[in-house]
């Protein structure tokens, strides 16, 4: 279902999206083929995975798995075409290309197959066959790459663990993540992330899937397949990453597209390579990204779906596929993903719902669709799956040799990274984180798969990866944002007209979003945004509500609401300008206009904004994906929310909803629609559950964030600083209130949501802050913004708001969804610029960085002061988000990274960000990027300071890890072989001895007289030793035989 839309979207989206989509679709196909349900995803994933992994990683396990995957692949080919011609295409293309690399890389992976996972997994795999198979694959991959992949993805996945839990999901997630990774390595990140996330969520999501079903529904399917595939995908992805992305390509194809697209563009095929990193990021974020994608996917199902697909298609795709498929699962995950991505498991995990989780993905994570679908998202099913919390444990248990495919290619060097064992610190955290992640990821989820990831991240991206991915994506988003930033900046100028500013921001966000979509992050963002947008649009009513809010806001000046709406809507409205850009937007646009209308007060501003937006669009032009993205964002967003919600829902049912709900106020308007599904389900919990929220938040944030951001943005600068502080307090304070407040202040809520989204924990805090701030602020744009900011800071979403409010939101969302969150913030900060640029480069953090600069400017204004706080907050948030989002990726490492990283990041980031903010927007951007890149890496990156460095550092780190893993593998293998040899020799000796004894015994028996024998027997029975000689001889033989038996047996 998705597919078609996807296709359409893809088509619309364009090759990129196409590719992206493809990926997604591929996933679908994957899903179809791979697991039937998962198969599509799987297919893609599997295809990718299968293909690549098959030969490579999974050879053994692979074989088991692979077959299905391959089937998936095959199927993929065939399957996709129908539904996903695009996908197929992409996949094919990707597949083809990447595949080869995949193979190569994969081979590498194959090298170490050891993985505990394998057997069990395989069994499971087999058991699930698709799912499991995929899972297995993942696992296999895990073993091999997968481990790594899984790690990444699993991270997402695992992170999401859910994946494991899901088993299927896990596979999915992992696989997805992997696949995604591969696929989306770039996109993968998303995808994986998202998917990852979603995957985990997947299962959860599935129900949600339904929710999303409408949107997510497909996801659901997707979700499943996706998941499978996702896993596969992931796997593939991972491979891809590893392989390059070859796998990626395959699955990645699409995902890559998105990322790849971006990446592709950048890397093009590279997808494997370069993009991979982003992918990785994506991957990491992947989940998230995935999620994102997922989200998109979910979107796809819906209009958004298409949009999403379109916009973020690739990412989305993946996500969608993964996320979409997954995402939905993931969706929350990010699944939608969120997360990946957030949610999606993020996408949601984000992407979870975010992507899936958010739709997760996301963040994983990552991202969800599936999850989304499944979860909500299933979304991000993969991601989400990853996010699936349960799995985390399992995953955790897995040895995660994770391949951090964050930057897959980059890490080509060492493909293995044992990221963390995933032991799931994630498990617990993962789950939560996952949730978040998912949300984030799902909003990323990554794969997790995040997707946050694997997002490696996914989610980490998966997490790291995911995160990275997410980051990347986010960054991408950022890029988009960046693009927006320009606008923003401009807007900032217009800031005075805060509304416009806000709007601008919103736009930016939107743009950002759009770009987001481009980027995975973007996608995620997009998703988020889209979702929101879509939501907004979809929800025209919501929209209206938003408008109301807008009005409210408007009064406030924040308009954020409007923005929110506007942002979403507005954005949409603005988007209208962009509208053109965003096709999907069209639909939205209409709503948007309404929004605009509501905006009227703001309108002018809006107009400006709109006009600006055009600028943005222009900027976006670069981000042109943006438009598409934008839609997608809407779509995405929507999905994301869904996913997210879903994811959340799956994950935290509440959360999803909460987010939604919270956002509901606004987002609801916006998100609602999407969330409605997802959210709705979750709404109640949502708030509570940050996770869902995150995604939602993401979505919402985008809306809310946007709104808030938007409105705030202008203010932000001013408010920013204080807000930051404020926010924090607020955040903390308002934890409870937030929900109410959130609702209350739609914008606020939204922001809150964003905030909440950020991290469940955070979220609350975030929420609180945001709310508080928001609440207070709502009236005041600044306040809001601040809150948003605070939120942003606190939360990714918040971050989003913060940086771009909108952007950030978006980003945040994305971020939320995935690492993105982290990213987001940074992204936002940077992203805006990034986005514009990134479109192509997006992948490249670098670019983003660059872009970011501008953004930074804007951001700086806004974030500047805030940035720092933001940073810190961001970091926290980000970390959080990332952790969450990243969780996929991070997730694996999140605790570590998150905890440690977070802090580090916080401080570092803060500093870095600050610094960056201050002077180096770029730096900041870089930092941000870095963040995004990998939260973990972030830290490192922070050090690096440059986006690039971030990427590089991440890569370096990944490489090192991979190398270490390889070493470990080698040693392990040697050790095992030696042990085996020794045992064999011992057995031989025992056998010889035994035979000797037997002979001796026979001889003795022969020689002995019956009497003696009888006597001996009696003695033996009594235990009295007969003649020493005889007994011994006699006795020994028996003993020996026993030994022998055991020996032989052994």
From Swiss-Prot:
Keyword Nucleus tagged: yes
Record keywords, A-Z: Cell membrane, Cytoplasm, Membrane, Mitochondrion, Nucleus, Phosphoprotein, Repressor, Transcription, Transcription regulation
Membrane topology: Peripheral membrane protein
Tissues expressing the protein: Ubiquitously expressed, abundantly expressed in testis, ovary, uterus, and lung. Expressed in cardiomyocytes.
InterPro entries: TSC22/Bun, TSC22/BUN_CS
Chain segments carrying region Disordered: 22-111, 126-285, 445-479, 511-531, 581-609, 720-740, 795-847, 879-919, 1015-1050
SUPFAM superfamilies, A to Z: Delta-sleep-inducing peptide immunoreactive peptide (SSF58026)
Gene Ontology biological-process entries: negative regulation of apoptotic process; negative regulation of hematopoietic stem cell proliferation; negative regulation of programmed cell death; positive regulation of apoptotic process; positive regulation of cell population proliferation; positive regulation of programmed cell death; positive regulation of transcription by RNA polymerase II; positive regulation of transforming growth factor beta receptor signaling pathway
Extent of Pro residues compositional bias: 58-71, 586-603
Protein name per its UniProtKB record: TSC22 domain family protein 1
Organismal lineage: Eukaryota, Metazoa, Chordata, Craniata, Vertebrata
């Amino acid at each position: 279902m998705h597919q078609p839309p996807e296709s359409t979207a893809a088509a619309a989206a364009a090759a990129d999206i196409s590719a992206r989509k493809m990926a997604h679709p591929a996933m679908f196909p994957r899903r179809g083929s791979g697991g039937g349900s998962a198969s599509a995803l799987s297919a893609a994933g599997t295809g990718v995975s299968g293909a690549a992994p098959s030969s490579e990683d999974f050879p053994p396990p692979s074989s088991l798995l692979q077959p299905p995957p391959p089937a998936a692949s095959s199927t993929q080919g065939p399957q996709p075409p129908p539904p996903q011609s695009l996908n197929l295409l992409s996949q094919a293309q990707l597949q083809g290309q990447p595949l080869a690399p995949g193979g190569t890389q994969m081979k590498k992976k194959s090298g170490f197959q050891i993985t505990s996972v394998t057997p069990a997994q395989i069994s499971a795999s087999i058991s699930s066959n698709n799912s499991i198979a995929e899972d297995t694959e993942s696992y296999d991959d895990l073993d091999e790459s997968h481990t790594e992949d899984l790690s990444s993805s699993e991270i997402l996945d695992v992170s999401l663990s859910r994946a494991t839990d899901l088993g299927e999901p896990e596979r999915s997630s992992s696989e997805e993540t992997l696949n995604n990774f591969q696929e989306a390595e770039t996109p993968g990140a998303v995808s994986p992330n998202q998917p990852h996330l979603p995957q985990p969520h997947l299962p959860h999501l599935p129900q949600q899937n339904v929710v999303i079903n409408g949107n997510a529904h497909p996801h659901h399917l997707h979700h499943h397949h996706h998941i499978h595939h996702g896993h596969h995908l992931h796997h593939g992805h991972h491979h891809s990453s590893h392989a390059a992305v070859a796998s990626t390509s395959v699955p990645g194809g699409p995902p890559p597209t998105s990322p790849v697209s971006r990446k592709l563009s950048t890397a093009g095929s590279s997808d494997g390579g370069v993009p991979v990193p982003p992918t990785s990021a994506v991957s990491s974020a992947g989940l998230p990204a995935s999620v994102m994608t997922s989200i998109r996917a979910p979107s796809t199902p819906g209009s958004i779906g298409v949009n999403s697909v379109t916009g973020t298609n690739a990412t989305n795709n993946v996500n969608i596929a993964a996320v979409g498929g997954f995402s939905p699962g993931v969706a929350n995950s990010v699944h939608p993903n969120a997360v990946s991505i957030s949610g999606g498991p993020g996408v949601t995990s984000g992407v979870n719902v975010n992507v899936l989780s958010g739709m997760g993905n996301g963040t994983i994570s990552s991202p969800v669709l599936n999850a989304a679908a499944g979860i909500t998202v299933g979304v991000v099913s993969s991601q989400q799956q990853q996010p699936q919390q349960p799995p985390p444990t399992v995953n955790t248990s897995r040895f995660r040799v994770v391949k951090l495919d964050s930057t897959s290619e980059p890490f080509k060097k060492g493909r293995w990274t044992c990221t963390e064992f995933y032991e799931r610190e994630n498990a617990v955290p993962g789950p939560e984180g996952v949730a978040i992640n998912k949300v984030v990821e799902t909003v990323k989820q990554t794969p997790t798969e995040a997707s946050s990831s694997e997002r490696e991240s996914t989610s980490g991206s998966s997490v790291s990866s995911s995160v990275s991915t997410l980051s990347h994506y986010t960054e991408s988003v950022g890029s988009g944002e960046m693009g927006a930033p320009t606008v923003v900046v401009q807007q900032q100028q217009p800031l005075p007209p805060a509304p416009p500013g806000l709007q601008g921001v919103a736009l930016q966000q939107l743009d950002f979003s759009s770009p987001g979509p481009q980027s995975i992050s973007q996608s995620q963002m997009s998703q988020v945004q889209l979702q929101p947008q879509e939501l907004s649009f979809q929800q025209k009513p919501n929209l209206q509500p938003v408008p109301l809010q807008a009005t409210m806001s408007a009064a406030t000046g924040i308009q954020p609401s409007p923005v929110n709406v506007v942002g979403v809507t507005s954005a949409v409205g603005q988007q209208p300008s962009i509208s053109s850009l965003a096709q999907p937007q069209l639909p939205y646009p209409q709503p948007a206009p309404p929004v605009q209308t509501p905006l009227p007060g703001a309108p002018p501003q809006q107009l400006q904004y709109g006009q600006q937006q055009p600028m943005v669009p222009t900027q976006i032009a670069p981000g042109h994906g943006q438009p598409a993205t934008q839609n997608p964002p809407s779509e995405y967003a929507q999905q994301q929310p869904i996913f997210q919600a879903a994811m959340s829902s799956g994950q935290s049912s509440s959360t999803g909803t909460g987010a939604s709900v919270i956002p509901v106020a606004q987002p609801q308007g916006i998100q609602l629609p999407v969330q409605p599904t997802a959210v709705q389900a979750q709404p109640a919990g949502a708030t509570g559950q940050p996770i869902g929220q995150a995604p939602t938040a993401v979505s919402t944030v985008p809306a809310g964030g946007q709104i808030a951001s938007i409105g705030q943005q202008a203010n932000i600068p001013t408010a920013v600083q204080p807000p930051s502080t404020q926010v924090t307090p607020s955040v903390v304070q308002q934890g409870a209130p937030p929900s109410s407040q959130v609702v209350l202040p739609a914008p606020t809520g939204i922001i809150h949501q964003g905030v909440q989204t950020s991290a469940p924990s955070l979220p609350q805090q975030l929420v609180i802050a945001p709310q508080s701030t928001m609440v207070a602020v709502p009236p005041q744009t600044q306040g809001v913004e601040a809150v948003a900011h605070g939120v942003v800071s606190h939360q990714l979403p918040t971050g989003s708001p913060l940086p771009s409010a909108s952007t950030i939101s978006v980003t945040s969302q994305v971020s939320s969804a995935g690492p993105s969150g982290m990213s987001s913030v940074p992204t936002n900060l940077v992203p805006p610029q990034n986005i514009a640029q990134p479109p192509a480069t997006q992948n490249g953090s670098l670019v983003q960085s660059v872009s970011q600069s501008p953004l930074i400017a804007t951001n700086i204004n806004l974030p500047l002061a805030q940035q720092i706080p933001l940073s810190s907050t961001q970091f926290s948030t980000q970390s959080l988000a990332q952790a969450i989002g990243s969780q996929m990726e991070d997730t694996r490492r999140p605790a570590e990274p998150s905890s440690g990283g977070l802090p580090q990041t916080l401080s570092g980031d803060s500093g870095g960000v600050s610094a960056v903010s201050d002077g180096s927007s770029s730096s900041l951007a870089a930092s941000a990027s870095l963040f995004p890149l990998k939260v973990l890496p972030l830290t490192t990156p922070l050090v690096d300071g440059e986006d690039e460095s971030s990427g590089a550092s991440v890569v370096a780190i990944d490489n090192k890890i991979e190398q270490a893993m390889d070493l470990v593998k080698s040693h392990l293998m040697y050790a095992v072989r030696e042990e085996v040899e020794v045992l064999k020799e011992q057995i031989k000796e025992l056998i010889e001895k035994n035979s000797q004894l037997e002979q001796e015994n026979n001889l003795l028996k022969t020689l002995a007289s019956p009497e003696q024998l009888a006597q001996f027997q009696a003695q033996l029975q009594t235990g009295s030793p007969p003649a020493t000689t005889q007994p011994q001889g006699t006795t020994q033989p028996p003993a020996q035989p026993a030994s022998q038996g055991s020996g032989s047996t052994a």
